[in-house]
């Protein structure tokens, strides 16, 4: 089992910065949503950020080395998790920071695949090891994170049952869906699925599976695909699902979809803040690092 978890936190958070359609937020919450990276918004006990809870679950799952990919203006992460670039001790986790630099000529970061490529360039030891990757603005369970550590598949991702996600149906319908074979090996990822093709994408349990960006990768075989990832024609970004599919084309039967049926709290927009706060209050009344 590997001990490395890379957390994607360098994005532009553009949807979070849009004006809220609800009026259930305080002035402080609105200010944080507009100014902070999503994972640093204070939705938890005593105003602690969502990322605390993700790190807690990572620790419970047995991860030791955490690499947080931050943007060029990501100094606030260091106020929360350690002032050094390398080897900060946060409740027994070893936290280091990679920086996703924005290329000349661009205003926004170049996508999740670019973020991970910059991270493995800055921490080349990852290219000879296995590691997990996830978002900073989702709260994955310790059980799901442990499944990524435990799998013997070279590459893997958590394949969530779409029906178990507690989001509005309109939002869920926009999620990309994964096509798996009878052994749960990844065959394809379909973006913006239309209702008429959904039946073709059901797995052996009859479930529609979606990815929430919780991955496990073999560093040595993934590197080439990260380096050569093409730009998505519509979104003008380099994205991890593209890397995954290119890897599958070259190495079939090496990317396992691990079936899970549970909700994954998500901080995408201001409308999510109250829901995530309520979820944490119910499921994590205390941030207990000793448990």
Kindly give the residue locations of the regions a language model identified.
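Conserved alpha/beta core of the MobA/IspD/sugar-nucleotide pyrophosphorylase nucleotidyltransferase superfamily
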Residues: 189-291
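Conserved beta-loop-beta/alpha segment of the NTase-like Rossmann-fold superfamily
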Residues: 92-177
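Hydrophobic packing residues within well-ordered alpha-helices of enzyme cores
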Residues: 16, 77-81, 148, 226, ...
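Phosphate- and divalent-cation-binding pockets in alpha/beta enzyme and binding domains
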Residues: 76-79, 143, 243, 275
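Conserved core of the sugar-phosphate nucleotidyltransferase
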Residues: 141-224
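Conserved N-terminal catalytic core of the sugar/cofactor nucleotidyltransferase
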Residues: 1-7, 13-31, 44-130
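A structural signal for short hydrophobic beta-strand segments in well-ordered beta-sheet cores
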Residues: 40, 177-180, 257
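Cofactor-binding loop segments of dinucleotide-utilizing enzymes, especially the Rossmann-like FAD-
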Residues: 8-11, 71, 136, 160, ...
């Amino acid at each position: 089992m590997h001990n490395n978890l890379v957390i994607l936190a360098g994005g532009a958070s553009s949807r979070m910065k849009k004006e809220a359609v609800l009026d259930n937020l305080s002035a402080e919450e609105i200010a944080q949503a507009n100014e902070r990276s999503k994972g640093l918004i204070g939705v938890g006990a005593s105003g602690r950020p969502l990322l605390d809870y993700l790190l807690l679950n990572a620790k419970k799952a047995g991860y030791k080395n955490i690499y947080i990919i931050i943007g060029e203006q990501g100094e606030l992460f260091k106020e929360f998790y350690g002032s050094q670039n390398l080897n900060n001790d946060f409740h027994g986790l070893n936290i280091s920071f990679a920086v996703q630099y924005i290329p000349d000529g661009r205003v926004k970061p170049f996508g999740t695949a670019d973020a991970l490529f910059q991270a493995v360039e800055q921490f080349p030891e990852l290219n000879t090891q296995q590691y997990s990757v996830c978002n900073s603005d989702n709260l994955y369970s310790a059980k799901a994170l442990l499944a990524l550590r435990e799998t013997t598949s070279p590459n893997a991702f958590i394949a969530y049952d779409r029906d178990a996600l507690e989001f509005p149906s309109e939002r869920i319908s926009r999620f990309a869906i994964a096509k798996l074979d009878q052994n749960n090996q990844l065959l394809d990822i379909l973006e913006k699925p239309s209702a008429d093709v959904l039946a073709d994408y059901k797995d052996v349990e009859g479930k529609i599976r979606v990815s929430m960006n919780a991955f496990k990768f073999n560093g040595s075989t993934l590197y080439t695909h990260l380096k050569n990832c093409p730009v998505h024609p519509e979104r003008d970004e380099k994205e991890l699902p593209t890397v995954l599919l290119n890897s599958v084309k070259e190495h079939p039967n090496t990317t396992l979809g691990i079936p899970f049926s549970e909700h994954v709290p998500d901080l995408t927009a201001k409308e999510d803040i109250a829901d995530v706060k309520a979820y944490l209050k119910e499921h994590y009344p205390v941030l207990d690092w000793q448990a």
